[in-house]
Amino acid sequence: MLSPKRTRFRKQHRGRMKGISHRGNHISFGKYALQALEPAWITSRQIEAGRRAMTRNARRGGKIWVRIFPDKPVTLRPAETRMGSGKGSPEYWVAVVKPGRILYEMGGVTENIARRAISLAASKMPIQTQFIIS
């Protein structure tokens, strides 16, 4: 699973996902990409599941770039705990994704292989996405 090596602070506010993505919304490395159409938190497990699905489907051909990184800690309180007594401890990491953000890129394969691999990765995501070609 992806997670930061170290962070300045252990816990973060939840924040808001307003507007569209102004950074990371163009294809930079590969020829094909998966683009988010909705705002969401994508967990490190979901990112890894999508990456594995793409890698398995493409087999040894091509190269895959993961364009998002889970850098936001999500805290959870233990089950059956009374209210108060502070914020819960960090449980997992998420990447904050806004509409327009590129999630994965792929290159070095034909379009139909890329489309199939990226559609498998898209099925692992909790949001609507689209396949784009540079």
Swiss-Prot record:
Subcellular location(s) of the protein: Plastid, Chloroplast
Keywords: Chloroplast, Plastid, Ribonucleoprotein, Ribosomal protein
GO annotation (BP), single: mitochondrial translation
GO CC terms in record: chloroplast; mitochondrial large ribosomal subunit
Coiled-coil stretches: none
Ranges where the record places region Disordered: 1-22
InterPro entries the UniProt entry points to: Ribosomal_uL16, Ribosomal_uL16_bact-type, Ribosomal_uL16_CS, Ribosomal_uL16_dom, Ribosomal_uL16_sf
Domain of life according to the entry: Eukaryota
GO MF annotation list: rRNA binding; structural constituent of ribosome
CDD domains given in the database record: Ribosomal_L16_L10e (cd01433)
Entry's family note: Belongs to the universal ribosomal protein uL16 family.
Subunit structure: Part of the 50S ribosomal subunit.
Name of the protein described by the UniProt record: Large ribosomal subunit protein uL16c
